[in-house]
Amino acid sequence: MIGLTHYLILASLVFVIGLVGIMRRRNLIMLFFSSEILLNSANIALAAISKYYFDLTGQIIAFFIVAIAASEVAVGLGLLVLWYKKTGSISLDSMTNMKG
């Protein structure tokens, strides 16, 4: 039977994958994807702990995190499209020469 520790180990591994993606990538789209992976690892942990304690609060919070993450991605990708139209690049290095 799959227990709580299995889910928490999975959530930890997914979290580490997201952290490595954030630290290693210079592309802004990949940074967005990596941050979504981090949020999904938190959702896995919340849902697993919620199921373990027979409480729906964690699953409800995970549902709201998914909804907020979807709106975050929509706004973030819109900003990235505008940035690409302005600079022609979506590299993290292209953001260092912003002028106010």
From Swiss-Prot:
It comes from the Bacteria. NCBIfam families: PRK05715.1-2, PRK05715.1-5. NDH-1 is composed of 14 different subunits. Subunits NuoA, H, J, K, L, M, N constitute the membrane sector of the complex. HAMAP family: NDH1_NuoK. The gene is nuoK. NDH-1 shuttles electrons from NADH, via FMN and iron-sulfur (Fe-S) centers, to quinones in the respiratory chain. The immediate electron acceptor for the enzyme in this species is believed to be ubiquinone. Couples the redox reaction to proton translocation (for every two electrons transferred, four hydrogen ions are translocated across the cytoplasmic membrane), and thus conserves the redox energy in a proton gradient. It is found in: Cell inner membrane. GO terms for biological process: ATP synthesis coupled electron transport. The keyword Protease does not apply. Its main location: membrane. Belongs to the complex I subunit 4L family. Keywords: Cell inner membrane, Cell membrane, Membrane, NAD, Quinone, Translocase, Transmembrane, Transmembrane helix, Transport, Ubiquinone. It catalyses: a quinone + NADH + 5 H(+)(in) = a quinol + NAD(+) + 4 H(+)(out). Its EC number is 7.1.1.-. The chain crosses the membrane at residues 2-22, 29-49, 60-80. GO terms for molecular function: NADH:ubiquinone reductase (non-electrogenic) activity; quinone binding. It is a multi-pass membrane protein. One of its GO terms (cellular component) is NADH dehydrogenase complex. Gene3D superfamilies: 1.10.287.3510. This is NADH-quinone oxidoreductase subunit K.
